[in-house]
Amino acid sequence: MLSNFFSKNKLFKSKSSKGDAAISESSQASSISEPAINESHSETEGKKVIKRFLIAYRSVTFPLGFLCVTASCDIQISKKEYVISALLPFPCDGELHELEDKLTDLVHKKVSFSVEYQVVPVRQHRIKGIKNIIAVSSGKGGVGKSTTAVNLAYGLIAEGCNVGILDADIYGPSIPTLLGLKGEKPTSHDGKLMNPLESDGLSAMSIGFLVDDANATVWRGPMASRAFSQLLNETDWPELDYLIVDMPPGTGDIQLTLAQQVPVAGALVITTPQDIALVDAVKGISMFEQVQLPVLGIIENMSYHQCESCGHHSSLFGTGGGERVANTAKTPLLGQLPLDIRIREDADRGCSFITKGSAGELAHLYRKIARHVAAQLYYQLDMRSPTTAELIMPELKSSTANKSSAADLFSEAK
């Protein structure tokens, strides 16, 4: 039984995890009838209260309970605080920070979490250093996919894990601009692998780092697909819990290559509530289903505009579109993001409000969605697609017969 969980698990030595902001998500937790203990109560009684709270706790991130996903958990008492040590399979610093506040109020003594996140690969693959690859897609352009991908990556970092981003939009790369790395060039320590560039702890690679803005990338599908494959496989990625892949809009060669050649753990579909965007989002979901690539959920961007003066929400592109598509596709609606000028301004400047201090409302939204994505990936554990990468497109088979280096590939584009 869960009540015996603590007595059966030894303390796991772990690193401290500090949340940056209290996020309102865990208000969905089950209410606890246990009264707050008075200062006269013993520390042992306080420990019991914490145990009962954790046993009963439920939220969007922990629908089955906190202890159902905790590999190890222990409560230790010191003169100043209770320390809950735990081993968790996905990052959730923001929610743990709120739990610390709730438990501190409950027992009238400081409560803190000391956790280690042990993210494991959902699929086995041969790409060194990367545990899970998440594709961020959209059925059409102009829905804010790339901006969402970047802020989602920063949100995952803020929640406590190591993240990279790969720009798969060979024809219109935007990641260099969004990260403030425009004009930067990758280096190589061995002449074979490229070192990813870094922005505020986010490792990044894009064809935009290799091709000048003034030079159009005029490549046919097979060459673009090969370029993407080499960007992925010939980058010396650090140890990453998640690699976010910003895919080009639509359902073309790059999407098929990614789904069939690369061990993607799951895909996210970005849409707006507008009908014309929803139609294309449905097509994107259908494509992923046909190639047996699991869809983790839908993120609805530009859901509403909030008036800066009175706070009124205006639904400029309609309402409920993302939810309808999610219900039809039987996939979660992971979050709804506003149409906010601050998002656009930061994107143009090449910075993110999440890295500047995660206490704002927008940072809360992106971090909450990041938690939902990480949790959904863990709960889904979808193993339907092949566990090893395999080239299946005839053009790619012929083009890789005489394999060239990344440097050779991009010199061909000049």
Report residues per predicted region.
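Conserved catalytic-core segment of NTP-binding enzymes
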Residues: D241-Y242, P248-R349
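Switch II (G3) loop of P-loop NTPases
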Residues: F209-R220, L231-Q255
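Extreme N-terminal, non-catalytic leader segments
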Residues: C68-A135, L381
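C-terminal boundary of histidine-terminating zinc-finger modules
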Residues: R349-G360
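Phosphate-binding loop that captures ATP/GTP phosphates
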Residues: L156-V218, S225
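Walker A/P-loop phosphate-binding motif and the immediately C-terminal alpha-helix
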Residues: I133-A168
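N-proximal, solvent-exposed amphipathic alpha-helical segments enriched in charged/polar residues
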Residues: S7-E25, S31-C73
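A short, charged, Gly/Pro-tolerant segment at domain boundaries
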Residues: I369-H372, D382-A413
